[in-house]
């Protein structure tokens, strides 16, 4: 049985995505595959090329013939050079740079805006000195009120004592 390593297309219109599959050469393009060994997304920047190198080496070793587009992908990943024993087995595959985290972006913007990283609140705090001045008059106002409350309390026991004496006299 003639076995080919070929691209099976899937994805939306004008957004092609491919599976790199091992299939019988007589099967149609998107037909039944023996094994899927990778994927290829040409519309990404840079293109996503993922090939299971171990499985590709196995299928090339048992005689599977890659189609021309798959051969180019195998050269980019370095699997073809490894199979043939040629120099350059590391390949020329480009990797996407990792995106910076949102926390790093926020800290950078904060440092740019204020001149240094700060974990404090972004709004300025109110000064406490005027608040202390306001507290002193309220304490003074509270003292006379306490004195006034103490006076009726002092009179109340005297009245209670006077009442207790009055019934005893009768």
Curated annotation (Swiss-Prot):
Q: Does the keyword Cell inner membrane apply?
A: no
Q: Does the keyword Nucleus apply?
A: no
Report the source organism.
Answer: Mycolicibacterium gilvum (strain PYR-GCK) (Mycobacterium gilvum (strain PYR-GCK))
Which residue intervals are annotated with compositional bias (Low complexity) in the record?
Answer: 151-170
Any one Gene Ontology molecular-function term assigned to this protein's record: structural constituent of ribosome
Q: Where is this region: Disordered?
A: 109-170
NCBIfam families recorded for this chain? PRK14520.1, S16
- Feature: compositional bias, Basic and acidic residues: 131-150
Name the keywords, alphabetized. Answer: Ribonucleoprotein, Ribosomal protein
Whichever gene encodes this chain, its name is rpsP
Q: Which GO terms describe its cellular component?
A: cytoplasm; small ribosomal subunit
Name by which UniProt lists this protein: Small ribosomal subunit protein bS16
User: What family does this belong to?
Assistant: Belongs to the bacterial ribosomal protein bS16 family.
Do you know which InterPro entries this protein is assigned to?
Ribosomal_bS16, Ribosomal_bS16_CS, Ribosomal_bS16_dom_sf
């Amino acid at each position: 049985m003639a076995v080919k390593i070929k691209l099976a297309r899937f994805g939306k219109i004008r957004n092609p995505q491919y599976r790199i599959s091992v299939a019988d050469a007589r099967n149609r393009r998107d037909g039944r595959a023996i094994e899927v060994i990778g994927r290829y997304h040409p519309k990404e920047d840079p293109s996503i090329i993922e090939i299971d190198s171990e499985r590709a080496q196995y299928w090339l070793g048992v005689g599977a013939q890659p189609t021309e587009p798959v051969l180019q992908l195998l050269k980019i990943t370095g699997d073809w050079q490894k199979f043939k024993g040629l120099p350059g087995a590391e390949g020329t595959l480009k990797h996407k740079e990792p995106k910076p985290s949102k926390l790093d972006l926020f800290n950078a913007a904060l440092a740019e805006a204020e001149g240094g990283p700060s974990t404090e609140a972004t709004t300025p705090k109110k000064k406490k000195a005027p608040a202390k001045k306001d507290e002193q008059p309220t304490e003074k106002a509270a003292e006379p009120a306490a004195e006034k409350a103490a006076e009726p309390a002092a009179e109340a026991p005297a009245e209670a004592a006077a009442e207790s004496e009055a019934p005893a006299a009768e």
